[in-house]
UniProtKB/Swiss-Prot annotation:
<keyword id="KW-0539">Nucleus</keyword>
<dbReference type="GO" id="GO:0042752">
    <property type="term" value="P:regulation of circadian rhythm"/>
</dbReference>
<feature type="region of interest" description="Disordered">
    <location>
        <begin position="398"/>
        <end position="452"/>
    </location>
</feature>
<feature type="short sequence motif" description="LXXLL motif">
    <location>
        <begin position="142"/>
        <end position="146"/>
    </location>
</feature>
<feature type="region of interest" description="Disordered">
    <location>
        <begin position="609"/>
        <end position="637"/>
    </location>
</feature>
<feature type="compositionally biased region" description="Polar residues">
    <location>
        <begin position="242"/>
        <end position="258"/>
    </location>
</feature>
<keyword id="KW-0010">Activator</keyword>
<feature type="modified residue" description="N6-acetyllysine">
    <location>
        <position position="144"/>
    </location>
</feature>
<feature type="region of interest" description="Disordered">
    <location>
        <begin position="98"/>
        <end position="138"/>
    </location>
</feature>
<keyword id="KW-0090">Biological rhythms</keyword>
<feature type="region of interest" description="Mediates interaction with RNF34">
    <location>
        <begin position="348"/>
        <end position="796"/>
    </location>
</feature>
<keyword id="KW-0804">Transcription</keyword>
<feature type="modified residue" description="N6-acetyllysine">
    <location>
        <position position="77"/>
    </location>
</feature>
<keyword id="KW-0694">RNA-binding</keyword>
<feature type="modified residue" description="N6-acetyllysine">
    <location>
        <position position="756"/>
    </location>
</feature>
<dbReference type="InterPro" id="IPR034833">
    <property type="entry name" value="PPARGC1A_RRM"/>
</dbReference>
<feature type="modified residue" description="N6-acetyllysine">
    <location>
        <position position="182"/>
    </location>
</feature>
Length: 796
């Protein structure tokens, strides 16, 4: 540990000297000039140290090209060793332990995972292409630091130089708490991986973009236990964070104002790390840091005012979004990312982050194709960057990761997600504006809603989308899961329509919009299914005869206009047949015809009125109730209905004529039997009931009628059941006259007999008289004879 403290003091002293002399000068002019005043000789490995110095003098020409990067290289390796030592201390006894082999294997694993790439043939090559020599003896710590590739420290060196003042101020804090040093670990590892990708002069960014946009399959080379071990290391490392991590990030600049490799006589012209390339690379890294660079700032443009400063609520981790160069490095970077988080848990440490952290790499490459930008500009600490799932990526091991992550989260209480964090990154990428507009509107800066626990989120996801290992993601499922991954409350998701799963629409959902028409799985078949329409069963709740005439929603009309028109015609025909005025079940009285017809028109009109109110599209087809006629699908059906109506009309007329003839025969029979009495000169205000009551004293009356004339004379006919009663009324009827009335006229058979065209011959000698035997004299005369006879009669 004393050796580590000595190296840290030496590094910071050299950085301070470089800041005083100028940033254009090399930060470390020569390795033997390191400040070793505080070095403890007892803890120093003399052979390894001198061997390293001897190798350094032999390779002076190669080392001179990278002296400006050597302090940061040593600083990074010491950080990694301290990180490994801290891991061993925290996992075993939480006591200080000397440096032994426990830390070096993890150091080797991290180094191999971060440096090794699939696109590079020799990862440890120098900028000029000469590989460093390998020694057969046991490599010491300093040898490991010196043998590390030099091009892995380019992006970190200048950032350390620009932030020298902050590191000098906090030197004592770094010395007392070595765990803080690992804050720079994930950042420098990420910078090292990206710097090694950019070997050509103008091609590095294009090749990097090409590699980032390749949507490869989820890695299967690493076993699952590798991820579990990385997750265990992250659990131990995240306990050692302090507040100085945030202060260190606040002192970081957003972009570089000077090139990372200043021109010097030792710098070859053919070096692949030119100014513009390195600036762009570091801009990618710094813009990936959450909240430090505004989303609209170009990668190569320096931002001086730095309006987006880090806050204690923001998470400095951005490692999960920047695509690593290889599948092997992806796991180690993910483990280091979770280890560099603060003690307060955020959404990236939640259960959903464990599920979605593996898919963010492919998602970022997919978004790069949409944005058409030369560099990656995503924020890794925001949920919407991590929650977008690719269609082709379905991780089978998600359930195991969720289970392990839930066990880890039970140790620490999750903290609330700051609403400002969502708003500060809403505009980070234009492709996200459409998908997160509703989420940003619903979350206000002063929102105090209770955040969902991870178990509740997992329960909601399993409820609506099934188990994660068996889920099939589509566009609609991705949007819904994006909402559920944003750590909102239960009330937010309870507003989602529940007819998505059932395929049926609730009341009032199709009143103003037609975008949910695809939810109706069952076609319109005329069945009485109230849940399919925009009117509930309340339409038929008050004894309406048009209960099954509820109109379907507007979307069904737009999808099947012809079929609905045919259904409407057949339905109208059915209604007209059942409510026809010539129904056989109607009463035989003549007045029932008009009442039935008016009832039919009322009911059909009410039905059409309800249909018109519930479905505006029916208004063009509906006519007035009295002018609308039933429609028929075929001419044969029309002929059949017409013949039925004609047949019914003939039968009705026949029955009516038979009734009239029967009444006439009964009247004639009553007249012949002398049971009909004619009563004349009655008052004009006399009613039939009054006349019947007054003459009923003589006997039982079958029929009584009163007729009024225009001249004011009134008369009536009374038909008795028996003839004797009629005679008694004819003889004693005058006794019923009142004082203010005239005498009644009482006759048999009534006056109607006097208006007959054939009268009976009252001559008693009619049988003896034969008109044929009597012949007139004028019958035998012609015209001339008759004329002469007339003239003679005139002379007389």
């Amino acid at each position: 540990m004393a050796w580590d403290m000595c190296n840290q003091d030496s590094v910071w002293s050299d950085i301070e000297c470089a800041a005083l002399v100028g940033e254009d000068q090399p930060l470390c002019p020569d390795l033997p000039e390191l400040d070793l005043s505080e070095l403890d000789v007892n803890d120093l490995d003399t052979d390894s140290f001198l061997g390293g110095l001897k190798w350094c003098s032999d390779q002076s020409e190669i080392i001179s090209n990278q002296y400006n990067n050597e302090p940061s290289n040593i600083f990074e390796k010491i950080d990694e060793e301290n990180e490994a030592n801290l891991l061993a201390v925290l996992t075993e006894t939480l006591d200080s332990l000397p440096v032994d082999e426990d830390g070096l294997p993890s150091f080797d694993a991290l180094t191999d995972g971060d440096v090794t790439t699939e696109n590079e043939a020799s990862p440890s090559s120098m900028p000029d292409g000469t590989p460093p020599p390998q020694e057969a003896e046991e490599p010491s710590l300093l040898k490991k630091l010196l043998l590390a590739p030099a091009n892995t420290q380019l992006s970190y060196n200048e950032c350390s130089g620009l932030s020298t003042q902050n590191h000098a101020n906090h030197n004592h804090r770094i010395r007392t708490n070595p765990a803080v040093v690992k804050t720079e670990n994930s950042w420098s590892n990420k910078a090292k991986s990206i710097c090694q990708q950019q070997k050509p002069q103008r091609r590095p960014c294009s090749e990097l973009l090409k590699y980032l946009t390749t949507n490869d399959d989820p890695p299967h080379t690493k076993p699952t236990e590798n991820r579990n071990s990385s997750r265990d290391k992250c659990t131990s490392k995240k306990k050692a964070h302090t507040q100085s991590q945030t202060q260190h990030l606040q002192a970081k600049p957003t972009t570089l104002s000077l090139p990372l490799t200043p021109e010097s006589p030792n710098d070859p012209k053919g070096s692949p790390f030119e100014n513009k390339t390195i600036e762009r690379t570091l801009s990618v890294e710094l813009s990936g840091t959450a909240g430090l660079t505004p989303p609209t700032t170009p990668p190569h443009k320096a931002n001086q005012d730095n309006p987006f400063r880090a806050s204690p609520k923001l998470k400095p981790s951005c490692k999960t979004v920047v695509p690593p160069p290889s599948k092997k490095a992806r796991y180690s970077e993910s483990s280091c990312t979770q280890g560099s988080n603060s003690t307060k848990k955020g959404p990236e440490q939640s259960e959903l982050y464990a599920q979605l952290s593996k898919t963010s790499v492919l998602t970022s490459g997919h978004e790069e194709r949409k944005a058409k930008r030369p560099s990656l500009r995503l924020f890794g600490d925001h949920d919407y960057c991590q929650s977008i799932n690719s269609k082709t990526e379905i991780l089978v091991s998600t359930s195991q990761e969720l289970h392990d992550s839930r066990q880890l989260e039970n140790k620490d209480a999750p903290s609330s997600n700051g609403p400002g964090q969502i708003h500060s990154s809403t505009d980070s990428d234009p492709c996200y504006l459409r998908e997160t507009a509703e989420v940003s509107r619903q979350v206000s800066p002063g929102s105090t809603r209770k955040q969902l626990q991870d178990q509740e989120i997992r329960a909601e996801l399993n409820k609506h989308f099934g188990h994660p290992s068996q889920a099939v993601f589509d566009d609609k499922a991705d949007k819904t899961s994006e909402l559920r991954d944003s750590d909102f409350s239960n009330e937010q998701f309870s507003k989602l329509p529940m007819f998505i799963n059932s395929g049926l629409a609730m009341d009032g959902l199709f009143d103003d919009s037609e975008d949910e028409s695809d939810k109706l799985n069952s076609p319109w078949d005329g069945t009485q299914s109230y849940s399919l329409f925009d009117v509930s069963p309340s339409c038929s709740s008050f004894n309406s005869p048009c209960r099954d005439s509820v109109s379907p929603p507007k979307s069904l009309f737009s999808q099947r206009p012809q079929r609905m028109r045919s259904r409407s015609r057949s339905f109208s025909r059915h209604r007209s047949c059942s409510r026809s005025p010539y129904s056989r079940s109607r009463s035989r009285s003549p007045g029932s015809r008009s009442s039935s017809r008016s009832c039919y028109y009322y009911e059909s009109g009410h039905c059409r009125h309800r249909t018109h109110r519930n479905s505006p599209l029916c208004a063009s087809r509906s006519r007035s109730p009295h002018s609308r006629r039933p429609r028929y699908d075929s001419y044969e059906e029309y002929q059949h209905e017409r013949l039925k109506r004609e047949e019914y009309r003939r039968e009705y007329e026949k029955r009516e004529s038979e009734r009239a003839k029967q009444r006439e025969r009964q009247r004639q029979k009553a007249i012949e039997e002398r049971r009909v009495i004619y009563v004349g000169k009655i008052r004009p205000d006399t009613t039939r009931t009054e006349l019947r009551d007054r003459f009923e004293v003589f006997g039982e009356i079958e029929e009584c009628t009163v007729n009024l004339r225009d001249d004011g004379d009134s008369y009536g006919f009374i038909t008795y059941r028996y003839t004797c009663d009629a005679f008694a009324a004819l003889e004693n009827g005058y006794t019923l006259r009142r004082s203010n009335e005239t005498d009644f006229e009482l006759y048999f058979c009534g006056r109607k007999q006097f208006f007959k065209s054939n009268y009976a011959d009252l001559d008693s000698n009619s049988d003896d008289f034969d008109p044929a035997c009597i012949k007139s004299k004028y019958d035998s005369l012609d015209f001339d004879s008759l004329l002469k006879e007339a003239q003679r009669s005139l002379r007389r």
